[in-house]
Every structure is written in C-alpha cells, then in structure tokens.
Amino acid sequence: MIEDISKKIAWLKKNPKMLKGIFRGIERETLRIQKNGHFSKTIHPYLIGSSLTHKWITTDFSENLLEFITPTSDNIDYLLSFLTDLHSFTASKIKNERMWPFSIPYCFNDQTNIQIAQYGKSNIGKMKTTYRIGLKNRYGDLINTISGIHYNFSLPLFFWTNWENNQNKKNNTDLISSGYLNLIRNYYRFGWIVPYLFGSSPAISSFFLKNTKKKYKFKKNKEDIFYLPWSTSLRLSDIGYSNTNILDLNIMFNDFNEYIESFQNALKTPSKKFINIGLKDEHGNFKQLNTNILQIENELYTQIRPKRKTKDGESLLEALKNRGIEYVEIRSLDVNPFSPIGINKNQILLLDLFLIWCALIDSPKIDKTDFLLTTKNWERIIYEGRKPNQKIYINNNNETKTLIEIGQIIFKDLNEIALILDSNSNDLLYQKACKETQLFLKNPELTYSAQCLNFLMTTGIKKTGLYLANKYHEKFINKNYFNLNQSVLEQEVIRSHQKKIEIEREDILSFEEYIRNK
C-alpha cells in the first residue's frame, strides 16, 4: 500500500526551510482560430516574433499552434502574471483571431487544412519542420494539434543534500538524479489523480476516432462530438496524444544509466513501421528525420519526463548524461478552459504538494508487471475516472481499493505538507488549495472534466469555446502588463528576427550533412 510518512513529515516540520526555493516553469499550448471557431489559416504572425528564436513565444506542431514559455521562477504569482503578459501581447497582434480555450480542437470536418510549423531556411529551422513532417506521417496531423500544459518543477538543492534517504549517494549529481527518478516512479503509480482532478477533455471530435479501436462505448451529441459519461482526459488516452509505449522501449526509470541507455537505443534503433513510410518522397524531400523508433528525444510522449537545460548544440540526452537530472516536466495537464491562461494558482499549489509527496514516499523499483498495473490505473481514470466506486490497483496481486480511499490517504499527507509550505510563507494558500481540491474526491461533479462535460452537453463545444475565447480575448487586450511591458516585448520581436537571420547566414553545411552529423 502507501508508506506511512509521518516520520518524514515530522522531520520536515523541524526543517521547513528544506522546501524553500521550489522553482517552476510553465509551457502553455493553444490553437489560433478564426472568429467562427475554425483553424486559423494564417502563418505565425511576424509581429509576434520569430518562432525559431523568440525566448517566450513559439509554435508547436502547426503554424497556428502557439506555445507560450515562461522563465523559471520560485514565485508563483510572477509566473502566472508573466504568462498573462505573453497572452495579452499576442492577443494585441491577432485582433481578428482568437485563442482556443480547450485542449481538444473543434473540428467541423476531416478536411481541416493543417499547415506544419515553419522555422525558416536555416538547418536547425528545417530540422524542426522535418521532425514535424515525420510526426504527421507517423501519427497523423490532426492528433498533433491537441494542446496541453507542461509544468516544470524542481526541488531546492538543500532538500536533496539533506534528505535522509539520500545520504548514501556518491555525489550531488547522483543524489539528485536518483531522487527525481524516485519521484517519477511514484508519479506513474499515483499521478492518475492529476487527470481525475484537473482533466478537461472528456469529449473528442469524431474525426479523432477514425481508424482507432474503441475500447469503450462512446455516446454522441448533436455536434458529432463523442464522449464518455465518466471520462476525464481523453487527450491522455490512446485516442489522443500518445505514441510509443515506454514499456516496449524498456524505459523503466529505475536506474539513471539504464534510462539513458534505453533512450539512446530508441533513438538509434530502426522501426519496421517507420521504414515503410520511407525517408524521402519521389521529389527527394524528407518525410521524416530518420526511420528510427524516435526521430529525436521530444518524440517520447510520457506523462512525466526528467529534464535538464541544454547548452548550445547539446541534445537533452547529452545534457542529462553530463550533468544529471535538473527538474521534471509534468505533461499530463490538460488546458484548463476555466482559466484565460490555461492553468490557475490552485492547480500549481496542488501540483507542488503532490510532487513533494512523490519525492517523500518510498519508491520501489518498477518491474513490467507493476508498470502494466499502473497503466491500467491511468486508463481507468482517463476513461472512467468519475465512475461511482471506481477501483484502483494497489499492488501486483491485483488487490484494489476505491479511488476515494486512496485519494483520502494521499490528501491526508498533502494537508500535512501544506502546513509546512505555508509556514515558510506565513499564509494559508497551500492548505486552502488542498482542502478545496480534496472536495473533488467525494464530489466528482466539481472536477474540471465534469464541469466541461456539462457545458459541452448543454451549450456545445463550439458555442462554449467561442464564448470563452472571445471573453478571454477582450480581457487580454484591455489588461495592463504585470511584469513585462510593450517595449520589452517589441524589442524581443526585433531581436528574435535578427537572431533568425544570423543563424541562417552562419550555416555552412547542407541540410543532408547537418542531419547526418546529428
């Protein structure tokens, strides 16, 4: 079952400063749409900056899929206001367009023209576009327009170096990497609680269901939107944004060196399925970067990833190998449609508590049987999380308990951790967020997915989406900046375009040579 961590919490209560200095970062994706809800057909606006080199505003899969990236900070209000400033600036440059508030796009037919993101004529720009062409050919383009929130989280160095469980590690790098792998394994075990609480994609367009095996009996509304009565986050399902089963790749997060080796193997091992796509078309244009299981590191779609900031010319794996894990990236958050910026403060506070808890509790190594059971738990919550008396596997003997029972055990600890964090800042923010969110366990109608489904059934996805998109747009264009200002943002636009031109001028190798050297 779940370890009793009362002694560990008692230790933290005596040493609350161990949890002072948590750093976070947010990445928010959102589709640019026309006023009628259809996909924008325009390229990434020049007035926003270069998507290749802008520090804070870029594109993801397609030209109309915006991505906002905050710097890291230990101040939650700063992060949220910075993210709001980026939205306000963007809204001022796309006055005839809107930002779609849901993770799942509104698709009125299957002929939606999706323009893959373009990054210019430099080798790095061509590589980014070719990678996306590969994603289209491997998984389809519509599936890659599903948007989400990525939450980056790191615990203070002081915590890792003083944490009693880590005293036998050789050096700080090993100690921290091992600690984050413990956290990651526990996130796989218990992270299903995140889509239960905050999942916001209980419905999906019929076009996403083409050529997929339906494990569950979907219902359909008048807009041709398919839904399940108890679902939470279809974005995280095999219908949505997923590709490779990490079990097949033997990526188990048990040992740092084994993780690196397994990841490298996936990047080097050819895939029969992708060989059949072909590397180039009849005109000699690349159809994908290579025919390996993964083209690059970013293609491994998982609920949580170990990360490290990279230096110029360095890959993520090289950075991890050289300097260890620096932070974790949570990828299982849907866009929160009830927040103009896709995420709110309560969510961040709750995620902090839960990730600290994942770092504190015992984290045995995961074997394949364990991993299959954790996958079943995630699947149950994704498809039927709000089902009354929903059961969760608690060990590999197929023993189960109800979601409410396990959730209450988790929240008992989270409330204790909240007390410690609030003592550092002399307020009640964490305790308040914890108590409010705990109500979702016994009152599933309070969950984001239940609220979303209610709107989709009564008002419809198009009407609800456009109402929220217009409401948020007006809010953004009439809002004063918090941290940034118009001048700083305009200067970044100019700098980004200049930097893009510099990169293009400095290229020496042909694109083929560049790819070969990667």
UniProtKB/Swiss-Prot annotation:
The keyword Cell division does not apply. Gene3D superfamilies: 3.30.590.20. HAMAP family: Glu_cys_ligase (MF_00578). It holds the Pfam family Glu_cys_ligase. Belongs to the glutamate--cysteine ligase type 1 family. Type 1 subfamily. Its EC number is 6.3.2.2. Pathway: Sulfur metabolism; glutathione biosynthesis; glutathione from L-cysteine and L-glutamate: step 1/2. It catalyses: L-cysteine + L-glutamate + ATP = gamma-L-glutamyl-L-cysteine + ADP + phosphate + H(+). This is Glutamate--cysteine ligase. The keyword Cytoplasm does not apply. GO terms for biological process: glutathione biosynthetic process. GO terms for cellular component: cytosol. GO terms for molecular function: ATP binding; glutamate-cysteine ligase activity; metal ion binding. It is an enzyme of class 6 (ligase). Keywords: ATP-binding, Glutathione biosynthesis, Ligase, Nucleotide-binding.
